[in-house]
Regions:
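Residue-level detector of alpha-helix boundaries and kinks
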Residues: 1, 26, 79, 85-87, ...
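Alpha-helical bundle segments that constitute or directly flank the non-heme di-iron/ferroxidase center
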Residues: 1-25, 47-58, 129
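Hydrophobic packing residues in well-ordered alpha-helices of helical domains and bundles
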Residues: 2-9, 38, 87-94, 124-127, ...
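Short amphipathic alpha-helical segments, especially helix-boundary/capping motifs
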Residues: 2-3, 14-18, 29-33, 74-79, ...
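Acidic/histidine-rich alpha-helical segments that form the ligand environment
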Residues: 7, 74-114
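Solvent-exposed, charged/polar functional surfaces in cytosolic regulatory/catalytic domains
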Residues: 15-22, 96, 100-104, 133, ...
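Conserved catalytic core of Hanks-type protein kinase domains
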Residues: 22, 44, 107
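Short, contiguous alpha-helical
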Residues: 27-73, 110-151
Length: 151
């Protein structure tokens, strides 16, 4: 079974790893807008990758089922929590969560992947899409402040 999402997830995970490695603590505290900082956005990524991992493990045991969520409400509720996570901890959590879900997706059976695809929710498999949105935003902020990008 072809799994093009594996390469894309890996690419964006490595992009995340490189961004974290070159970001100072000062960089991680930069404001993104609407109350978010770079570190908070990384904690946000960690949360959503961790949620995807929890679902994958549940689905392996119990079968795939829709898991509805009000993402805007969750993100609004998460913001104050993400802001109190120490910046370097948030950055490292983002990498750890990305590694964990990507590994789970790479090792999932073809049958499980097929069941997930039937949900018609691209974000379930293509974790790269969510990472890319936020990494693009973060790199734009860093670039606008002369901190540049190595991607």
């Amino acid at each position: 079974m072809e799994r093009p999402f594996v390469a894309e997830n890996s690419r964006e995970r490595e992009r995340l790893r490189a961004l974290v490695a070159r970001s100072s603590d000062e960089d991680l505290n930069l404001k993104l807008g609407e109350g978010w900082t770079i570190a908070a956005a990384l904690a946000h990524l960690a949360f959503w990758d961790q949620r995807a991992l929890v679902l994958m493990k549940r689905w392996k045991q119990e079968g795939v089922a829709p898991s509805l969520i009000d993402t805007d409400a969750v993100n609004d509720a998460l913001l104050p929590l993400c802001l109190v996570v120490p910046p370097r901890v948030a950055a490292n959590l983002a990498i750890t969560a990305a590694e964990a879900i990507d590994q789970e997706l790479e090792q999932a059976s073809p049958e499980l992947i097929s069941e997930i695809e039937r949900l018609k929710d691209r974000f379930r498999l293509w974790r790269s899409d969510h990472r890319r949105v936020h990494l693009d935003e973060i790199e734009a902020i860093l670039s606008s402040r002369g901190r540049g990008s190595n991607t």
